[in-house]
């Protein structure tokens, strides 16, 4: 057997914002609350200060995607379990009986350089990518949560990336595999893995970096003529070594991607509009400017041409990128937070009405992170907790057209005199945008895993209640969506000022057969006998009828709500 070296280059384009954290900067907590500023979570950087996506991060995402595909399809398609072990290396689970050393991976995933054209640096970093800020909402008070303000450096959607993976198959002539050790992969196994990786990327099964539940990190194959190239060479001979070191990197190899269809995800698409306008404001950049510009992000008085001018600098909507030409965006994290807050409210209302002893009537003193950990069980299954990841992903919603803009001005009243308060004139720049659909995805495998873990059931247990609990979680989410369709759940900011109203026109649910849920195609027809919220509730009753009662719940609990108890 001789050594064969491969090099795979895949040309990608970001289909959503991409963030992968490097070394976190230390927050100076000695400063007072009013003097504190956010510390951005930035990409890892090379020695020249350029942001990059580390090969370790990409390799972990690819390995997890391959492992999940094998669990779903077995060894009939793509590499087998043994072949994956040969390719990715040992994971340290062979036990103490083997005297052979752990085998390193045959796959090397190289660092992905991020495109930085047009971006400038600051005092700390040579190149700085755009950042997006967000904050968690206190579930009890409805205000911004303390110690829950986040700022992430990100690469905008639509940027091209080049992913390079090299591999080595076989052993040099005369070298034998130690007894009991895992043999290195052969050329056939390497090419089979590369076909699977290309197929996973092509079918949208791979996401890089963090904030994936907010829809970040998704990539797609480039539209270029040759989205991927695979070359190989045998460097054991002089001719093979020259071939490998040439500009071409060896002989070209044809590889057909594996068909990885069937995402294992339930998809909910909501067609909607907003009669009042949606605003998630772009925060003001940190800088040395104080005084007049200090509150510009909130629409407070800004710089004026004349000292006595009453003009304000309006709060402007957040866009999908740093350019003015980028579309207005309703972040997936914002929608997801609104859905979670309402789901928590519904679940806690039911638990209090049933006088569940594990639910306290007063939880006003809990911090926002503690609130997430104490959320009812079905909420944690869907949205995650401080311990495990949730099953629900909400993608960024882009405006298909900005539409005309208008400046909305308002002022605060003096609570003592009843007149206009001095220096408290605010304004927002609101666009009458036409929006794309809100898209929610539920990872059914993750939901079932969370449900079984919450019930304390091991994987593969017969007579599992995990599927019933998963359907119960869908029922809870369905109630939240019914409230959204009824117009009682505003999105974005300024909801108490009349903004953020949502008018749902249609809702489609697909891919729920794994939970025994049929596809839905519901529309809000004018003059119809049943409104869209009632149609949603009707579908939820059908789902609830197939849910067996949780045996851990006490008397008086039935159907989906019984799974709010006992975990």
Briefly describe each language-model feature range.
Residues 1-567:
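Small/polar/charged residue-enriched interaction surfaces, especially the RNA/DNA-contacting tracks
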